């Protein structure tokens, strides 16, 4: 595994699976940008902003675990395909805690410079999450 692939694995293991907030500061460049990661598709700017998002997400979901299925590294970027499982244990976007164990799939790309995350893109199945929480009906083919 290359250096950037190892870095993206470390990020997801320590930040999400282990809940280590200190890893956010250690691995993020102060000017890092997470494109489209905040509420309503807004960008996350810097580690402090990411920590606000991360704390809110972790207050809504407990027992978070990410399994990484595939990893690709090319140049200064690493990409993973993952599945996140968690328990809906706190309010989330106006949805009262359901206690349900839910699972979502996603893909993440991180760009590194001098060993730090400088840009990140995450796409995950938010519709599936809302369906599992009972917030929207399951889509039906017509």
Predicted regions: what is each one?
Residues 1-142:
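C-terminal and inter-domain tail/linker signature
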């Amino acid at each position: 595994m290359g250096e950037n692939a190892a870095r993206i694995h470390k990020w997801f293991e320590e930040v999400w699976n282990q809940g280590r907030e200190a890893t956010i500061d250690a691995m993020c460049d102060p000017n890092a940008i997470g494109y489209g990661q905040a509420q309503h598709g807004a960008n996350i700017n810097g580690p402090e902003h990411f920590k606000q998002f991360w704390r809110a997400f972790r207050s809504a979901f407990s027992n978070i675990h990410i399994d990484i299925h595939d990893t690709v590294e090319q140049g200064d970027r690493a990409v993973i395909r993952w599945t996140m499982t968690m328990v809906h244990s706190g309010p989330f976007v106006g949805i009262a805690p359901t206690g349900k164990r839910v699972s979502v799939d996603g893909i993440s790309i991180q760009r590194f410079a001098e060993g730090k995350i400088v840009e990140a893109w995450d796409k995950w199945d938010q519709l599936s999450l809302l369906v599992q929480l009972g917030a929207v009906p399951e889509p039906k083919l017509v």
